[in-house]
Amino acid sequence: MKESKKRVLVGMSGGIDSTATCLMLQEQGYEIVGVTMRVWGDEPQDARELAARMGIEHYVADERVPFKDTIVKNFIDEYRQGRTPNPCVMCNPLFKFRMLIEWADKLGCDWIATGHYSRLEERNGHIYIVAGDDDKKDQSYFLWRLGQDVLRRCIFPLGNYTKQTVRDYLREKGYEAKSKEGESMEVCFIKGDYRDFLREQCPELDAEVGPGWFVSSEGVKLGQHKGFPYYTIGQRKGLEIALGKPAYVLKINPQKNTVMLGDAGQLRAEYMVAEQDNIVDEDELFACPDLAVRIRYRSRPIPCRVKRLEDGRLLVRFLAEASAIAPGQSAVFYEGRRVLGGAFIASQRGIGLVIEQNKDWK
């Protein structure tokens, strides 16, 4: 198999971003090989046709079974545990980038490339993910679990561009129809409401969980709900309960099948606990004077401090208002636009004791 430092494997979905990625890298002199991972839905005909038009090698990897057994299963399991998952965060290290590395090795490619709107920066011997220039499309939040060995082989050509610039670029290159395509789905295997997807994939879920009670913070029953997996922390719309004032989901108790409701003020938090972290340089993270954390995609970074607990988890202290801490979501730590690491937001049960045990932390 031919090997070259200019041979790069591109993950091709057939969409706007991966098409632009291929064209840009071709212009830079790379030899492009495309691979399309079929994980859900129809045959990737668009990707085949685009690869043929660009004159590049193209392969299709049918990964529907392992994808369903890992990423989709995790997505469902998280909701069944009362957590709010982000499947892209799980998919990137466990599936997408792992598969790209395996195929790159098999096809003699030194590099892998994707259409993520993020950048990479080398500093002090480490590779850091950096937020892309387009704040509306930045995808650095989803990449925090990637290891250094993977990042050292990545190229993200779109990191310095806005989505509109990418559309304009495709139009200039003669890909007019492609430039006008709509946005891809936020979760690639779900069309519409995730609740319908849960019911479709788990027909037994409603019978298994059943209706439960909305309760107040004092434990007073407020009315019935459809089952705890169908609610997320911070949710206001779609509760189908009239309390005479706005109500938000504060807590979810899978064991009791209860969903606690309250007002917006009760969602605020000064601390949170996170787990299963991936930090680039711990000394840098813990000492960073300008550290901020993003607790959901597209949310504003919140100034914070972080310390390691004796049990290995992270305690995060917010230095500005934080609200709707949802277990299962990612907490991604930034210095400016540079990602220093991330972790999964843990269950906040027992956090009062953790705070008390660390009351001298400044």
From Swiss-Prot:
Keywords: ATP-binding, Cytoplasm, Disulfide bond, Nucleotide-binding, RNA-binding, Transferase, tRNA processing, tRNA-binding. Residues 137-139, 296-297 are annotated as: Interaction with tRNA. Gene3D superfamilies: Adenine nucleotide alpha hydrolases-like domains (2.30.30.280), HUPs (3.40.50.620), Translation factors (2.40.30.10). Disulfide bonds join 91-188. The active site is at 91 (nucleophile), 188 (cysteine persulfide intermediate). Its EC number is 2.8.1.13. Its main location: cytoplasm. GO terms for biological process: tRNA wobble position uridine thiolation. It catalyses: S-sulfanyl-L-cysteinyl-[protein] + uridine(34) in tRNA + AH2 + ATP = 2-thiouridine(34) in tRNA + L-cysteinyl-[protein] + A + AMP + diphosphate + H(+). It comes from the Bacteria. It is found in: Cytoplasm. ATP binds at residues 11-18, 37, 115. Catalyzes the 2-thiolation of uridine at the wobble position (U34) of tRNA, leading to the formation of s(2)U34. Belongs to the MnmA/TRMU family. This is tRNA-specific 2-thiouridylase MnmA 3. It comes from Bacteroides fragilis (strain ATCC 25285 / DSM 2151 / CCUG 4856 / JCM 11019 / LMG 10263 / NCTC 9343 / Onslow / VPI 2553 / EN-2). The lineage of its organism: Bacteria, Pseudomonadati, Bacteroidota, Bacteroidia, Bacteroidales.
